[in-house]
Amino acid sequence: MKTSYHHGDLANSLVAATVSLLETRGLDQLSLREVAREAGVSHAAPAHHFGDKSGLLTAVAIEGYQLLTKALLASQTPEGRSPDQRLLDAGYAYIQFALSHTAHFEVMFRPALTNSENPEYIASSLAAKEVLETRIRNFLLQQS
């Protein structure tokens, strides 16, 4: 067991266990029972909390979009940089995120695995998209 359950933190423990398993074993080997074992909780805990595998993977995708948004915002550079440099900074942050969060990235962009109608999923994905769109818009405005 790589992660441990702390009272009141079941959701985060299960998401962390899922990410760990995705990184080490891949999506094809992922099961709710394995996630429970990795998190050190009862085999019924993931289903009880997330409903099914899609619900759990939706939570992983939500966390991924939140992390991506944070990375993109952190890449915002001082006002002195041009819009094209700022767009490049966002591109580098995006690529770095994809390389360092492979499990999240894999789930985020495979909508068949998640519940894309989940309001939190929608909000988190739109937040990341908005940061990228703003950088692109500013770049295009500079070009005209």
Region spans (language model):
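Generic hydrophobic, amphipathic alpha-helix propensity
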Residues: 10-18, 35, 60-68, 72, ...
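Hydrophobic alpha-helical connector segments
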Residues: 59, 73-104, 127-129
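Helix-turn-helix
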Residues: 13, 17, 21-55, 59
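Amphipathic alpha-helical linker/stalk segments
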Residues: 2, 63-87, 132, 139-140
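N-terminal intrinsically disordered/low-complexity leader segments
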Residues: 1-9, 20, 80
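Amphipathic alpha-helical packing segments from all-alpha helical-bundle domains
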Residues: 73, 116-142
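Amphipathic alpha-helical segments used for helix-helix packing
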Residues: 99-116
